[in-house]
């Protein structure tokens, strides 16, 4: 599944190719997607100008502008497990009749770069999704967008998460730390790949209970998660299966993964063996040496979230 680094790469690739373009035509395959598309949205989208492209966690947000369309209208895109959002050059006489089922293209938009067809270049925005676990959602105004995000609450991204809040969240749950990293309501953007990589970088076993981590371990994990994600962004994400960037180019970070997908191989840090186990139905990769399971002394009795916050405030006074 594309995670934050992959989605950020798509956003960076597509921003100069989409912003300022006008959507001339829009065609939908009619296939059922997890995030369903409605046929009545086709008329709303046609004629719109794309004014911005932003990312929030694993979501892409395209702002749209058109006469008669309320302020705040736009599109939300989630790539799911196998989704791809790419732009290709085309001509004005493109035809959706040439679609082939094996291409798995579910939405395509003809884009115009100039004011008039005579002095414009044409391109197509394509949404592919073999497993159809993603999708594109249209919202007509800011209120609809706010309602959408209320139904899909997101925690802060690793670099935006205050340490005191992070420590408090871990102190308040006995769930396994790998499971907590995947909870988008607690911390957003991390998926299976970068959860494994973050835990390895921090030297923490994935089955540890979150509330067994002491303050230093929690701080180290948050810092390593930020570093892991930023390095992956610099390498254009990890192309392990279907992922490609917005210009249909593969990422490079799969060549630098320390544990994910390396079962049975030697740890790049200590030489220990990489093993795989199942946690909550997901594969987890870890080093048997530098992530050896051990009971942490944990927090002292009464060292709960409230006390941590009060201590932090006293330190800052």
Q: Where in the sequence are the language-model features?
A:
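Structured catalytic/nucleic-acid-binding cores of DNA maintenance enzymes
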Residues: 1-317
């Amino acid at each position: 599944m594309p995670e934050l680094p992959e989605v950020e790469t798509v956003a960076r690739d597509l921003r100069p190719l989409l912003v300022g373009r006008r959507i001339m035509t829009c065609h939908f395959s009619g296939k059922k997607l997890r995030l369903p598309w409605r046929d009545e949205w086709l008329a709303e989208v046609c004629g719109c100008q794309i004014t911005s492209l932003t990312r929030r966690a694993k979501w892409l947000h395209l702002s749209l502008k058109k006469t008669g369309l309320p302020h705040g209208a736009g599109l939300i895109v989630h790539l799911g497990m196998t989704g791809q959002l790419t732009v290709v050059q085309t001509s004005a006489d493109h035809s959706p009749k040439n679609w082939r089922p094996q291409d798995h293209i579910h939405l395509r938009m003809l884009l115009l770069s100039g004011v008039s067809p005579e002095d414009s270049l044409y391109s197509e925005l394509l949404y592919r999704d073999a497993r159809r676990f993603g999708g594109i959602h249209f919202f007509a105004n800011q209120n609809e967008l706010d309602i959408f995000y209320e139904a899909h609450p997101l925690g802060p991204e690793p670099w935006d998460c205050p340490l005191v809040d992070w420590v408090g969240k871990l102190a308040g749950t006995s769930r396994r730390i790998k499971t907590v990293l995947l909870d988008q309501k607690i911390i957003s953007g991390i998926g299976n790949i970068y959860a494994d990589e973050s835990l390895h970088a921090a030297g923490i076993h994935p089955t540890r209970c979150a509330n067994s981590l002491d303050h230093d371990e929690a701080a180290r994990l948050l810092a390593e998660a930020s570093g892991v994600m930023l390095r992956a962004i610099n390498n254009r994400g990890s192309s392990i299966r279907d992922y490609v960037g917005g210009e249909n180019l593969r990422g490079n970070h799969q060549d630098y993964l320390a544990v994910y997908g390396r079962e049975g191989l030697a740890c790049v840090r200590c030489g220990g063996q990489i093993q795989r186990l199942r946690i909550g139905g997901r594969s987890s990769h870890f080093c048997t040496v530098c992530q050896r399971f051990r009971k942490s002394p944990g927090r002292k009795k009464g060292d709960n979230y409230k006390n941590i916050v009060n201590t932090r405030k006293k330190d800052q006074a």
